[in-house]
């Protein structure tokens, strides 16, 4: 065995020598102790997070910090480092004698329990290697630390940091892993330790090569000698009362090598720093520079050596740690999104995060909808099976054959689930059966978003329907009809039979001779018999041929869909999806679903012009045959001529379902939600009508009537005016269909049975628009029902007729009260129509009927109530007006939010007239006049903003303006009556109107004059109210008499010679004539009356007219004035 490089004699000599460097260091320490600054700012990295407190623990053999024997270098490299490190007595093996210069023994401390790291602390195995080159001849590249003699002080027992007793070596653990605080190290109790340089290297076992085999004996010997040596490792741990001295500077520590050090692995960062010495209480503690592998340390430990460089580096470390945490969060979220993408759209798809989340949301909603629908179907099937007995099930299976299949026995491809609906900007429309990829009407999606792989293999496949349920196409039906027509017109059977019979006679005639023959007479007799029998046989054959063709067309050519069959499942699937699309407002997608539903029933819509022409001609022929009851009876035998009640019931139900779908498509086309021309719409209307008639009692009469009305609408819209008489026929059929079953017409169609509504529908000039026009007098109804739009137009027509009855009554009205009664009749009809024009809550379903589900139009009802109140005020029927006050006071929200001032003008005019026309108030209040002024302001704004107003707007403005003027006149007349009650004469000697009243009256009169420029019926009211204004102001009575005489004498002279000049100005009505009589008889001076008794005669005539008008209160006033003037004269009706 070779001699060890560190012998007993060498160690004694090294420890006995006095080191000059120790003396120099002690001298420097004494000089610099006076300059020690104990502030925390000198050591900024002392109390950072890596040096937080914790328990000190030793690294056991099984701990990650324990070094394996492979982590040591060769014994030749251990001797020099151990010789330089040991500054006191050491324990040697048995063969060696203890040195005499080591009087102090090292006290061994018991092992501390293993350290348990806290949360967030990662334990890193850090092997420690002490390198020492051979003493005699160092190898190249080996760094030899100087040897220092021991100081005169003795070694005190001190705890060892990171030291553990092992049978074959020792290990050091980094302070960051053991959570040792600087305050827990007894630095002041370690005297006698000289400042000796100690070179250590920490690297992973994977990057270090094992030592040679020849170095194993030395390795074991050295390990046995140094296992009890206390090693103090304190890299960069300092205290505030310590002094930091740099003894040895290693600028190239990141690249130096020793004899026993292998090259560091790539990617290993080297942390190299100067040898640091801590001096506290006469104790010198050497720090160890470490070589750290960055892959084995947490992020907050990578730059721990540079903590003392300043606070900027600390902030950078915190920023690095925060970025690392954010990176972990992002990585976790991205992993979950990738996992969600794999579940929803498959692993091969390439989607962004938003598309993945959108797909997931759509898929979840689809699953919820599918579960709900399956639960409903399950409950339906359970209830159906519970209601059937065993005998019914057996009979159904025996009669239905293979067509009536239960849901449990269906094929998987029929009952398979739908694919989830595509996203807004997602999958292409061909991926889902809910969209029509073949028609090209649905919007295509992006190719980067494929469908879910869970449904790629389960998509609905196009099944070949059974031959008996598919039926015949329309072009085949038309071809068969043409064939029958040709057989009836050309009669080929007669020609065929005639040729076959005449051929033998012609043949015998060619070879006969000139002589007589007895057989010739016999042949002549046989030909006469066949000629007599041939025509009936031919017509019988033709009749049989026609019957066979009709049976083939109506009985065996009609597609019949049995319940719970594959086509029925497909039909109801698309039907329910169409309901959802209608409720969502996606009318294009709803039309596509209805198109697919008809295709599932075996009734595909025509796709070419030829198919469209054939389908339209066939529907015309079929409707003509059904008018003769032949086609309707044959259609009732659809499915077969055998008496199968269940099959016929299923045929009627199939016809009903197809008719409802055709009708809904027709409604969508009429409202502009479905593309196509007039021929397409006519074909849809005829198809719905023919199938609804064939459905019989399977369809409700309200739905059948609605289909008739839709056909009448199509005639009104698409056909020329010469064929508009057909609308009367269809409306009559709808009325008969309603009365035949229940004896009552549905609420939505009652106005069609009224003479005014029937005349408006047939002769009115109106049109159905795809986008309903905004109106101030009604709200839009069902957006997919054209009948609701026509009802809305009729409501506005009724309101206009009621206003015109007051503004410009008919010239031939002999009765003065007729204008008010006609207006009230129109308003009553308007109230009934407004209950059926609004959009109902469940009107978007395919099976919903406008006749059964109706709503209310609050706007039309409010305008009707307001107009009725004004009419009752004009008739002086205040009790009837008071019953409508609550309806007028609550204006609808739609009218409150509108920007047009006309509804506000109407509301405040009602409030002002209600306050001023009350006969119980004699004096005007400022509040009532303020409301009146506000109403006048809104009315002027309405006249200024509607320069091109419609006729109904002008009629309403005339009514409101006249109402305000009448209210002001009534207030002035009550004041005059109260003042003149004290006088003896009938003429008014009371005070004139105030300036405020006159100014308001003149403003309203100016508005009336402005309205009369564009609306001619307002001119006659201008004359009357202008005369009233002159009377209120006390102006010259001459001009006032002329204005009143214009209203009095136009009515008498209008029946004379008439012409164009006489019709330029409208004639005054009975109400205007009565008002002029009262003003002239009460307020004109006696000088302007032609005779002494003319005043009494005028009052008597006014009383008779008022009695005709039904104004009982004004009649009582006239009688009282007559009693004062004539002394008991009474008025009798004449």
Curated annotation (Swiss-Prot):
Region (Leucine-zipper): 367-388
Gene3D superfamilies in UniProt: Helix-loop-helix DNA-binding domain (4.10.280.10)
Post-translational modification (record): Phosphorylated by AMPK, leading to suppress protein processing and nuclear translocation, and repress target gene expression. Phosphorylation at Ser-395 by SIK1 represses activity possibly by inhibiting DNA-binding.
Matches recorded under SMART domains: HLH (SM00353)
Start-end of Low complexity biased regions: 61-83, 424-453
Region feature Interaction with LMNA, mapped onto this chain: 227-487
Annotated region (Transcriptional activation (acidic)), positions in chain: 1-60
Site (Cleavage): 451-452, 480-481, 519-520
Motif 9aaTAD: where in chain: 27-35
Highest taxon above the source species: Eukaryota
GO biological process: cellular response to fatty acid; cellular response to insulin stimulus; cellular response to starvation; cholesterol biosynthetic process; cholesterol metabolic process; circadian rhythm; fat cell differentiation; insulin receptor signaling pathway
Family matches, as InterPro entries: bHLH_dom (IPR011598), HLH_DNA-bd_sf (IPR036638)
Residues annotated as transmembrane: 482-502, 537-557
PANTHER family in the cross-refs: STEROL REGULATORY ELEMENT-BINDING PROTEIN, STEROL REGULATORY ELEMENT-BINDING PROTEIN 1
Name this polypeptide is given: Sterol regulatory element-binding protein 1
Species assigned in the record: Rattus norvegicus
